[in-house]
Amino acid sequence: MRGRLSDIFREVTTPRAIQDRYLPPDREAFAAAEPPTGRVIVIAPTRAACETIELAVGLHLDTVLQREHGAQIQELAASGVGFGIVAGTGTGKTLAIRPIAETILHTTDLRVGVVNREREATPETPTWNVIIVTTGIARRWFQDNDIRATDTLIVDEIHQTSAELELCLALGKRVGCRYIWLSATVDPAFYAEYLGSSSVIESSAFDPAKAATVKIVNRDPLEFLDDKFLRAVFKDKRGVGVFLPTRAGVEQAAESVHASFPRINTAFYHGGEPIRVIRPFLEGTEKKPYVLAMTAAGQSALNVRGLDTVVIDDTRFTNIIERGKNVLSKLHLGSNEILQMAGRVHGRVDGGRVFILSDRDIDFKSLQPTAPEFQLAGDSERVALTCAALGVRADDLDLPVPLDRVSYRKALALLDDRGIVESGKLTTYGRAVEALPVDRPWAELLVNADDDLVPFVAVVSGIESLHRMTREERDLEGLVVPGSDHLTAYNVYAEALSKCGYTGEVYGLPRHQFDESVMEWAERRGVLVKSIEDAALGMASVYRSLGMPLPAKLPFAREHTRKQFAELLARTMPFDLVIDEQTRDGGNARVSKTSVCGSWGAIAGSLRYFAGKSGEPRAGIEGTQIPDDLIRKYATRTKPQLVYDPHRKHDQLVLMSRVEYFGFELDREIEPVREFPESLAAEARHILAQAAAREEARQVWIKKNHAAISAVREAYRRSGGATPRLGFDELAALYERQLAGVNSVEEFRNARLTVNTDDFVPPEE
């Protein structure tokens, strides 16, 4: 099957014209325009952070960091050595990028550009001396050798770990770049050592006179937000931030507060919502009292004005690597998270209050920053793809965390099977897949899809999942494609476009945009607007990479679309696969509760692992069901093998072939072998001899040899190895010599198989 699979995918030797729109369009011009000082490459964790940094580079503001450490920062920037800055919220560490860049480049003429999924590289890119990129774009530039040893890398918010960022750190070390890194309050020891920092500047806006009152309360969030607490909020006109671990929890908290106290301004924000919904809170125009519920991840880069009270749920969901799998697990918050969230009011505002909802006895005053938690160990495939793009071994990269060697080898074998990697390097097919701005499975579908399927694949490639696209209470009537979460999600987007959308431009690039009516539509359907906007961004970037015009309208997916899509999936199968709730490795996987797929049959999609109530890993899947006839159509038949099956009542020697489909065995075809064909005679005698040595074969002489075999082995043990050995291999070889000339199972059963002790142990011994 291995050879068959790789051959199938390597047939795609002339894929559609695909261009990586995020790389400099003219590499020679980009290299020639490199300033003598090198460029300053700023690596940001998110697209929003790119915009913040771009604005910050154009500002000249007085900050705590500049007042207390400005001269030291300028001296270090001019020295040519790497260094770090660890600074709390409100100190102005991002604003320090401008003076650092001016010092490094020996000019105040900063020509700043941004490259992320919204803003691709342009012919003007070579003229930029400060380039702000997200982690994924930085990794692509490293793979294309566009970042050089003369460049300085400034990593903003380095504490926001991700597999892409950690890979970029290793790639920058390989190139020999200088690192300047900016972090919130974490233990900087690891980064200082790993990145070879000459020093670490630590700064804080903490004012002891403004230390907050901190209380540990063992209550659930909804119980804590009771009438007594809300009356105090209203009376004192407080600005409250409630930090919770899940989107559903955030929405429930906001709904509960609004229902109990409508006179308190209430809102929520998480990764599924556009930032504009809380713009008044960020600009300081929202009147107190207010309660703003946010996910811990959603709030990390936001500066909420007027905040004087925070409520922190001591719970987080994070991925823990177990046997190469990312298992979503429920844990308590770490010190870094608690300090960062509490630090929004602790030591910053008069009368600040911090409530930590926890079943632990937390001594807040004793909390100290800890080292960051890294993510790279769970993304071996990304490491393998990057190494193949560079033509290097994973051993050549000084990764911040040890690589899971077993998981890495499996990932590399998969990429080789799929024709993406060959001899440690990307194939033509692999380069086409890597050039697309989507995850590898979706990129493979786009490379292999006919033009009429491209709109469907392009849209869904930008949607995390149907589950993450919708709220718990949703109305998808008329949009569901039975058996396909993928196409149902597509239909949700298609309806949003048809009812509320139009084709506009963002940063001069065509993209589907949506008018204000999308909010009402999304509320009625139970859809997250942010997921629609993200899908629009993803679709636009895919179409630009494919060199195709963005369609103004989209057809709805119907039954004929499902058949075409299922055919494409069955032919290429780039996703995880579950058949009858079983995974390839024999594990159990349930269909997700929000899926529109049935429980049985084959489902292609994304497996997600989560910890059950007792901590054991469990798996769920959503995706698209593949009919059995398509599974059979694209299944492969293995070459027949001669095997001895001792469990069969009759005809234990058989020719067996397997019908397999992407790691699943669908059927076995068995043909009894009684007479040995000349081409198989030697192999048949060898297999029967081994079966006899294991005492599995039905042969009258085998039991008669027990005493002799035991005597020979005992003599070998007593002599310390001086007498000949009679282990399994030696016994099988002895039997095989005695089977010379045997050409049928019947002759085997009647053959004389003997073990003569005198041949191994001299009679006198």
Language-model-detected regions and their locations in the chain:
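Solvent-exposed, charged interface segments at domain starts and junctions
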Residues: 73, 134, 229-230, 239-241, ...
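Residue-level detector of short coil/turn "hinge" positions at structural boundaries
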Residues: 309, 422-423, 550, 723, ...
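C-terminal accessory domains/tails appended to large, multi-domain proteins
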Residues: 47-48, 55, 67, 71, ...
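Second RecA-like catalytic domain
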Residues: 316, 364-664
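Intrinsic-disorder/low-complexity coil detector
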Residues: 23-24, 34-35, 207, 220, ...
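N-terminal intrinsically disordered, low-complexity tails enriched in polar/charged
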Residues: 1-10, 67-68, 478-487, 763-765
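P-loop NTPase motor module signature
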Residues: 1-445, 605, 609
